[in-house]
A protein has these predicted regions:
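Predominant activation on well-ordered alpha-helical scaffold segments within soluble catalytic domains
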Residues: 28, 50, 127-130, 134, ...
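Generic structural signal for helix capping and beta-alpha/helix-loop junctions
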Residues: 70, 155-157, 185, 372, ...
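Acidic/histidine-rich catalytic neighborhood of metal-dependent amide-processing enzymes
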Residues: 122-195, 265, 424
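Metal-dependent amide/peptide-bond hydrolase catalytic core
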Residues: 1-7, 35, 66, 195-425
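Acidic-glycine-rich active-site phosphate/pyrophosphate-binding loop
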Residues: 94-109, 188-200, 352, 384
Length: 425
């Protein structure tokens, strides 16, 4: 990196403190636009971001491949290197009856935090990406920077990141920076996801004849549930390199979750199975004709979705031939665990800048949740997440520390400069 590059980087990082009020205001304004998923409409927030970017002189493009699922794309520069900034617009809903200290869509700034639904997941990181995208555009940096604001990350990404990659030229890039909350770590990967519904069928009859007439679909389901739960016992097959990587990632997990990490550690290396919803029957005195359960399964490194799906089908058919399985999300959004090389350029510039800004060497980490990054990784593009700490994510009093929001923006500024200048040489 030249002296000029260092000067640009230092100036941009110092500007975060000068413009902290603008950064906080942008986050508050994003929070005040509900983008709950469900129902999933990002129309209003997408148009707000479009107007904001136009105020900086950009010509952002809106894409609405499915009604209400609006995505925003903007770019500056040209050629290579090409860095993609990625954040999602949708968020978990604020549930009726949640006990908030402030109105959930207020974006209130209080006690050193910006409060509100979506502040952490992920409007805090998104506001930093937007702010840095705009600020770095005026510095004469080489290469190209593209901002992607996607519509449906919370429900699988079919109409957001996946659709953009499949249909819009210039979205792939050389590497990806996501602003997802990462708890001070550099998140290089994530577990895979499989969501499915199992249904059993019986024969209705009057409840007074139970055991003598009809077939109870709920009882059939009861025999299947242990087999579904037992999928968590499938063991991962790891290469020596994957074993070393997993050990490193466990350190990052501890850094993220502190004292809770010991009890949660197995999440990274095992299949998890959550039987989250069960429905069956219409009345207590009628033998139920149908029963269904909705299941969320997360897949670690070393286990493939196809392996799990085949095992599930085999086990269910062995007990009840009438049982059916429906995979809730579009097949193209069901992927195994994905991760980026620990020594990729984007990983290294993230670690370097996080240490520069915070004074702490960040661990690499993995998430048990799902992000848009997986779609780029599946295409061989390194993708990492670095975003502000979040308290009570997805719950009452979700909030982001103001100082962490600012330090995240400084890291993002440095990453953009370093990636575009280092990769261009």
């Amino acid at each position: 990196m030249t002296t000029i590059d260092l000067s640009v980087k230092r100036r941009l990082q110092e500007s975060v403190d000068e413009d902290k009020g603008k950064l906080i205001d942008l986050l508050s304004r994003l929070i005040r636009i509900p983008s709950d998923n469900p129902p999933g409409s990002t129309v209003e927030i997408a148009h707000f971001i479009k107007d904001y970017l136009e105020g900086w002189g950009f010509e952002p493009r809106l894409y609405e491949p499915n009604k209400g699922n609006v995505n925003v794309v903007a770019s500056w520069g040209e050629g290579s290197p090409h860095l993609i900034l990625n954040g999602h617009l949708d968020q978990f809903p604020a549930e009726v009856g949640e006990k908030w200290s402030v109105p959930p869509y207020s974006g209130e700034v209080k006690n050193g935090f910006v409060w509100g639904r979506g502040s952490g997941d992920m409007k805090g990181g998104l506001s930093s990406l937007i702010h840095c995208f705009c600020a770095t555009s005026k510095q004469g940096l080489p290469g190209k920077l593209t901002l992607t604001c996607t519509s449906d990350e919370e429900t699988g990404g079919r109409w957001g990141a996946l659709w953009l990659l499949d249909n819009v030229p210039g979205i792939t890039g050389d590497s990806v920076l996501s602003g997802e909350p990462s708890g001070g770590t550099v998140r290089i990967g994530e577990k895979g996801m499989i969501a499915f519904t199992v249904k059993t069928r019986g024969k209705p009859a009057h409840g007074s004849f139970a055991g003598y007439a009809g077939e109870n679909a709920i009882m059939k389901m009861g025999r299947l549930l242990p087999e579904i739960e037992a999928l968590r016992n499938i063991t991962a097959s790891l290469t020596p390199e994957e074993k070393v990587l997993t050990e490193e990632l466990m350190k990052g997990y501890t850094a993220q979750f502190g004292h809770e990490a010991e009890g949660l550690a197995g999440v990274l290396t095992h299949v998890t199975v959550n039987i989250g919803i069960i429905r069956g029957g219409v009345k207590a005195n009628i033998v139920p004709a149908e029963c269904e359960v909705e299941v969320d399964m997360r897949v670690p490194i070393g286990v493939s979705p196809s392996q799990l799906k085949a095992t599930l089908t085999e086990r269910l058919r062995g007990i009840d031939l009438s049982a059916s399985v429906d995979y809730s999300r579009h097949p193209s959004t069901i992927l195994g665990a994905t991760y980026s090389p620990p020594n990729s350029i984007i990983t290294n510039v993230t670690r370097d800048n996080a240490k520069l800004v915070t004074g702490i060497e960040p661990f690499l980490s993995f998430t048990s949740g799902g992000t848009d990054c997986r779609f780029w990784r599946e295409r061989g593009v390194p993708a990492v997440a670095y975003g502000p700490k979040v308290y009570a994510m997805g719950a009452a009093d979700e909030r982001v520390p103001v100082e962490d929001l600012a330090s995240t923006a400084k890291v993002h500024m440095g990453m953009i400069v370093d990636f575009l200048t280092k990769k261009s040489k």
